[in-house]
Amino acid sequence: MLTVQELVDDNADNIPFNWIAGHGAAERNIRDDGMAAADLVGHLNLIHPSRIQVFGQEELAYYSRFDLRRRTHHMDELLIGGVPAILLADGLSPPQDLIDQCDQHQVPLLSTPVAAAQLIDLLRIYLGKKLAPTTTVHGVFMDVLGLGVLITGESGLGKSELALELISRGHGLVADDAVEFSRIAPGMIEGHCPPLLQNMLEVRGLGLLDIRTIFGETSVRRKMRLKLIVHLVRATAQDKFERLPLQDITQDMLGMPVRKVMLQVAAGRNLAVLVEAAVRNTILKLRGIDTLGEFMERQAMAILQSSK
């Protein structure tokens, strides 16, 4: 759960806040209740009292048109409705009755010189990331040819060795072992590394490797958007892999389907080359190029011509 104080501290560089009233409510929670980030903050709206209310010049002018009795009535309804905080944009100064009511109801009242529209945009982006659904996945997250690739598989299959080979070929490491994913938008999943494991890769027999120190600054990435999952499996006689799958394999991640390829681990197989090929093929599919579909059309055309 996010508090008002955390919001103020996290945005101190971009949004300088001045705390005016409601100092005792610094730990007041900003409840999302499954709402989108766009619904959590906006211009003054009495119909939606549970969101962060922003006063710009127009809102304050509208508020000031009412007499004290009506202002008190409307603000009481708003403050009782569970508003997390009231923000005054454009460097505006609040009327004394608004300060008194925020102190009375212990609701944070803050001001900032940032323009109202810009303030709302910045906070929506921040809240969208901060309150996004998250999960932690065991695997190695890489930047391969500009695509976010999650390498998964049971322990001992060589995920870290494969990552090391990809790094040596010029690709980048995002996270090893524990990858934190957040769904920051309806069709966008972003992955990053926990601070404790930043730049580290654990390889059996070698221990922990500081990839940034060994390979340089360009060998690591802060975050990437997940586009492909490469799942490693042991090659056994019992396994029967479909050589030409007609349907793309996907895996659900935070309620969103993500493309998935399965690679068998066997002696003599160059997995790094296979991963690169899988990424290139995924890029083609994202551009609307379906190699298998084109082959099947070509095959159907050949059969049709041979039957004449």
Curated annotation (Swiss-Prot):
Positions with a binding annotation for Mg(2+): 160, 202
Catalysed transformations (reactions): [HPr protein]-L-serine + ATP = [HPr protein]-O-phospho-L-serine + ADP + H(+); [HPr protein]-O-phospho-L-serine + phosphate + H(+) = [HPr protein]-L-serine + diphosphate
Obligatory cofactor(s): Mg(2+)
Gene Ontology biological process: regulation of carbohydrate metabolic process
InterPro entries in UniProt: HPr(Ser)_kin/Pase (IPR003755), Hpr_kin/Pase_C (IPR011104), Hpr_kin/Pase_Hpr_N (IPR011126), P-loop_NTPase (IPR027417), Ser_kin/Pase_Hpr-like_N_sf (IPR028979)
E.C. numbers: 2.7.11.-, 2.7.4.-
Top-level taxon: Bacteria
Region (Important for the catalytic mechanism of dephosphorylation): 264-269
GO molecular function, one term: magnesium ion binding
Active site residues according to the UniProt entry: 138, 159, 177 (proton acceptor), 243
Other noteworthy facts: Both phosphorylation and phosphorolysis are carried out by the same active site and suggest a common mechanism for both reactions.
Assembly, per entry: Homohexamer.
Domain comment, as recorded: The Walker A ATP-binding motif also binds Pi and PPi.
Family: Belongs to the HPrK/P family.
Function field: Catalyzes the ATP- as well as the pyrophosphate-dependent phosphorylation of a specific serine residue in HPr, a phosphocarrier protein of the phosphoenolpyruvate-dependent sugar phosphotransferase system (PTS). HprK/P also catalyzes the pyrophosphate-producing, inorganic phosphate-dependent dephosphorylation (phosphorolysis) of seryl-phosphorylated HPr (P-Ser-HPr).
Official protein name in the record: HPr kinase/phosphorylase
Gene: hprK
